[in-house]
Each structure stands twice: as structure tokens, then as C-alpha cells.
Design a protein with these regions (language model features):
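Active-site neighborhoods and metal-handling regions in enzymes and metal-associated proteins
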Residues: 1-96
């Protein structure tokens, strides 16, 4: 889990936003919207096929606001399947 978090942090660092990422990366969900598996620093529980997790990096700017764009991802035997299909590019989001 911490490897996934590291990839997200590296992307935010490249964009100059690493200090604005102050929340966990995501969590598992199923019967409950927030279940026990967390994606974040220091989380080492392995993902298993059949798990569904959120990947929702958030960027927050004090006094201004913030944004989280969430993907729901099914963990499969061969990798993953992104279950959401929402726009992520600014021009797509603003035009939606």
C-alpha cells in the first residue's frame, strides 16, 4: 500500500503540490463505504484479488479550498480494473 502512496506523492511532487497532499490516498470499501484497508504511508497490507479500493489523492490549499478526484478500482488476479469513468483533465471537467 505504501508503494501506491509513493507513486501518488511523486506525481504531486512533480506538480509542486506535495505539501498540499495532507490526507491518506484511499481505502477499501464493500459493505461499508470506509473499510479497514487504507492506502497510505506505512500501510503494508497487500492488496488481494477481489478487493475494491478508492484512489483519491486530495490537494488542499489553506484559505482557498481543495479537491479530491476519486477512482474506484477493483483488484484483479492480473492487476486492476478502474471502475469509474469520470473526466480528470481540467478542460473535460469544466466542460462537463
Amino acid at each position: 500500500m505504501s508503494q501506491i502512496d509513493a507513486v501518488a506523492r511523486k506525481a504531486l511532487e512533480k506538480a509542486g503540490l506535495e505539501k498540499r497532499f495532507t490526507h491518506g490516498l484511499g481505502h477499501s470499501f464493500g459493505l461499508e463505504i470506509h473499510e479497514s484497508v487504507r492506502l497510505g504511508k506505512g500501510q503494508e497490507r497487500p492488496l488481494e484479488a477481489g478487493m475494491v479500493v478508492t484512489v483519491e489523492p486530495g490537494v488542499y490549499i489553506p484559505g482557498f479550498g481543495g479537491v479530491r478526484i476519486e477512482d474506484d478500482v477493483l483488484v484483479t488476479d492480473s492487476g486492476n480494473q478502474v471502475l469509474t469513468s469520470l473526466a480528470k483533465q481540467w478542460d473535460e471537467v469544466l466542460g462537463a
